[in-house]
């Protein structure tokens, strides 16, 4: 009997050892001391986020988004892979964080004392506020006391705590917390007139306005608050230290500024009339030309090429300017000859030539400029000429900036129109402020196309899922009757 007992103990020990070799993190992940070690052991960082046009989304180019790129850089700094896990709302994120199913939550989450008590928080990297959104052309409430209809919020208990505090000042204040729809889906319902008000993150509202100009902001519900990543309450200090060092480095190297420029820089500019006209053109005009943009995109994103064409001509193949540039890409005679096309008003010829010219401009730029940023420099050259771009880079260097960094060069473009600067430059005066706005508009137009199609695809997926669910319910009802 004793021998049998020893054999059982030995067998169990070997079994646990084998499991530990294959799945060591299953034992490590739940302890404070070993959270960091668990990440290293499994070779992957699990990051929870929310699928929207700022934090995280996927398209034909793969995974994208502010939080994705920042999390990818953090995972790289740890020497592990990144695995993004998407959820519908903040409470789902936090539940998974509580269960240690994710290592951190990253979704532009605003600071709230309730969350800080429940979790560890990383360094602040941005700020935002809660705002009341309503539908344009409806009555705009001046404060919460004027709100007479339902207010909708996504599943966010911290926001609900804020509203409970405000309810002391506005006793009639009521709201509906939707536990199934995302904040973005609530804003879409608001834009379509299905619900009267939504309280949402100011970043998400500004982003949605770029494709749903019907959305308007009534007022801020709260002051601006810091945005943080959140970690499980019991996270070993090695992970917290690694995150702190990473965020400090991201600030110093310009990574954070570059990501803010890429994903947030364009959303602060909003013009209702321009955006409404543009969305109408995306729906009704772009489908005529998108096959040509895709055909001649080359190394570019076809949606960027389309955005350039809209900025140039509003997708009018017969557009003509007082200076003589013509066609959907608004080419000069010299450029048309250089690109060997005969008819600038022919959409296919114009798009082909415009794309080839942009590729040529990119090829003229030094290798010291990062590949992803070259297009913005090339667009300046497309607008005001390569010589003036060279001047802008030289001026940036003279002023102590980095001539290879788009953010540094961008802020100095308006100086090309000031005599004290252009008088010292080789190519002289240029309307650099127009080039600055030119690139900003194109970035905004491109992102709007990307997100318009993303929202359309999501709605199709949701509609199909609803239809499948309805069919399943009908089948179950039929079976029950039978």
From Swiss-Prot:
UniProt keyword Signal present: yes
Region annotation (LT domain) ranges: 268-482
Record flagged with keyword Cell wall biogenesis/degradation: yes
Positions of the UniProt region annotated as Non-LT domain: 14-267
Family matches, as InterPro entries: Lysozyme-like_dom_sf, MltF, Solute-binding_3/MltF_N, Transglyc_AS, Transglycosylase_SLT_dom_1
Localisation per UniProt entry: Cell outer membrane
GO biological process, one term: cell wall macromolecule catabolic process
Top class in the EC scheme: lyase
SS bond list: none
Signal peptide: 1-13
Any one GO molecular-function label of the UniProt entry: peptidoglycan lytic transglycosylase activity
SMART domains according to UniProt: PBPb (SM00062)
UniProt entry keywords in alphabetical sequence: Cell outer membrane, Cell wall biogenesis/degradation, Lyase, Membrane, Signal
Chief location: membrane
Residues at the catalytic site: 312
Domain of life of the native organism: Bacteria
EC number assigned by the record: 4.2.2.n1
Protein's job: Murein-degrading enzyme that degrades murein glycan strands and insoluble, high-molecular weight murein sacculi, with the concomitant formation of a 1,6-anhydromuramoyl product. Lytic transglycosylases (LTs) play an integral role in the metabolism of the peptidoglycan (PG) sacculus. Their lytic action creates space within the PG sacculus to allow for its expansion as well as for the insertion of various structures such as secretion systems and flagella.
PANTHER family the UniProt entry points to: MEMBRANE-BOUND LYTIC MUREIN TRANSGLYCOSYLASE F (PTHR35936:SF32)
Family: In the N-terminal section; belongs to the bacterial solute-binding protein 3 family.
Protein's name in the database: Membrane-bound lytic murein transglycosylase F
Organism: Haemophilus influenzae (strain PittEE)
Gene expressing this chain: mltF
């Amino acid at each position: 009997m004793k021998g049998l007992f020893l054999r059982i103990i030995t067998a169990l020990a070997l079994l646990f050892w084998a499991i530990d070799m294959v799945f060591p993190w299953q034992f490590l992940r739940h302890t404070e001391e070993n959270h960091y070690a668990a990440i290293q052991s499994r070779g992957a960082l699990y990051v929870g986020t929310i699928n929207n046009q700022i934090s995280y989304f996927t398209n034909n180019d793969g995974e994208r988004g502010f939080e994705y790129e920042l999390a990818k850089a953090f995972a790289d700094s740890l020497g592990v892979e990144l695995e993004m896990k998407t959820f519908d709302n903040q409470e789902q994120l936090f539940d998974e964080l509580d269960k240690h199913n994710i290592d951190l939550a990253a979704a532009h989450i605003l600071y709230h004392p309730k969350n800080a008590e429940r979790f560890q928080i990383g360094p602040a990297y941005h700020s935002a506020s809660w705002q009341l959104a309503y539908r344009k052309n409806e009555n705009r409430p001046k404060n919460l006391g004027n709100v007479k209809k339902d207010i909708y919020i996504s599943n966010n208990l911290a926001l609900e705590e804020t509203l409970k505090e405000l309810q002391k000042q506005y006793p009639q204040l009521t709201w509906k917390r939707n536990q199934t729809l995302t904040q973005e889906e609530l804003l879409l319902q608001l834009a379509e007139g299905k619900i009267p008000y939504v309280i949402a993150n100011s970043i998400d509202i500004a982003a949605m306005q770029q494709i749903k100009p019907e959305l308007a902001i009534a007022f801020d519900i709260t002051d601006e608050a810091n945005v943080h990543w959140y970690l499980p309450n019991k996270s070993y200090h090695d992970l917290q230290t690694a995150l702190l060092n990473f965020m400090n480095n991201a600030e110093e190297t310009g990574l954070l500024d570059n990501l803010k420029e890429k994903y947030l820089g364009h959303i602060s500019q909003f013009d209702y009339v321009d955006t409404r006209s543009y969305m109408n053109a995306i729906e009704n005009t772009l489908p005529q030309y998108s096959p040509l943009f895709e055909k001649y995109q080359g190394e570019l994103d076809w949606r960027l090429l389309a955005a350039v064409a809209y900025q140039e001509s509003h997708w009018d193949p017969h557009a003509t300017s007082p200076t003589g540039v013509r066609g959907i890409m608004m080419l000069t005679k010299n450029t048309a000859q250089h690109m060997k096309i005969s008819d600038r008003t022919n959409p296919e010829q114009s798009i082909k030539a415009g794309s080839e010219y942009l590729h040529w401009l990119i090829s003229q730029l030094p290798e010291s400029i990062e590949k992803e940023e070259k297009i913005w420099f090339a667009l300046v050259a497309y607008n005001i000429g390569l010589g003036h771009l060279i001047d802008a880079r030289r001026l940036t260097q003279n002023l102590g900036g980095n001539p290879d960094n788009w953010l540094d060069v961008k802020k100095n473009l308006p100086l090309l129109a000031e005599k004290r600067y252009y008088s010292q430059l080789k190519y002289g005066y240029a309307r650099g402020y127009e080039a600055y706005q030119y690139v900003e508009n194109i970035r905004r137009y491109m992102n709007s196309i990307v997100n318009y199609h993303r929202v359309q695809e999501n709605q199709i997926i949701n509609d199909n899922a609803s239809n499948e669910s309805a069919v399943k319910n009908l089948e179950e009802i039929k079976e029950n009757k039978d």
